[in-house]
Amino acid sequence: MQFMLLFSRQGKLRLQKWYVPLSDKEKKKITRELVQTVLARKPKMCSFLEWRDLKIVYKRYASLYFCCAIEDQDNELITLEIIHRYVELLDKYFGSVCELDIIFNFEKAYFILDEFLLGGEVQETSKKNVLKAIEQADLLQEEAETPRSVLEEIGLT
């Protein structure tokens, strides 16, 4: 996978993950082109399209479009399944995810994506393991944010 974009029906970019090095200018150009292309397509049209030298795979869930660019030899159906698995993980974590969850908790959405995909390849296939890792990270964050006394810090209590 070269990149993943999440954008709204209004064309607002909500999440972007790039797995290939590109300049900011090129990223903006790609994003603008793809958002326009995908939003212009009718709902009954195929979720795969050829674009430049890549294949674009996208799926709409509620008000969000999940859009991935893959290389010519990659499997479109597996990519659709990757998108679906990511949505399932977001649903499990947020409890029926919506666009606002991603807007206000974008760092969690990125963290979930990073636990699931590494370098554009699936890192962990088990939803349970991904969610367990996220739970552990949440616990660590809560621990770090909990105020402790000086005596606790140096281990005297």
Swiss-Prot record:
This is AP-1 complex subunit sigma-2. GO terms for biological process: intracellular protein transport; melanosome assembly; platelet dense granule organization; vesicle-mediated transport. It comes from Homo sapiens (Human). PROSITE patterns: CLAT_ADAPTOR_S. Belongs to the adaptor complexes small subunit family. GO terms for cellular component: AP-1 adaptor complex; AP-type membrane coat adaptor complex; clathrin-coated pit; cytoplasmic vesicle membrane; cytosol; early endosome; Golgi apparatus; Golgi membrane. The gene is AP1S2. Coiled coil: none annotated. Adaptor protein complex 1 (AP-1) is a heterotetramer composed of two large adaptins (gamma-type subunit AP1G1 and beta-type subunit AP1B1), a medium adaptin (mu-type subunit AP1M1 or AP1M2) and a small adaptin (sigma-type subunit AP1S1 or AP1S2 or AP1S3). Binds to MUC1. SUPFAM superfamilies: SNARE-like. One of its GO terms (molecular function) is clathrin adaptor activity. The keyword Heme does not apply. The keyword NADP does not apply. It is linked to Pettigrew syndrome: An X-linked syndrome characterized by intellectual disability and additional highly variable features, including choreoathetosis, hydrocephalus, Dandy-Walker malformation, seizures, and iron or calcium deposition in the brain. Intellectual disability is characterized by significantly below average general intellectual functioning associated with impairments in adaptive behavior and manifested during the developmental period.
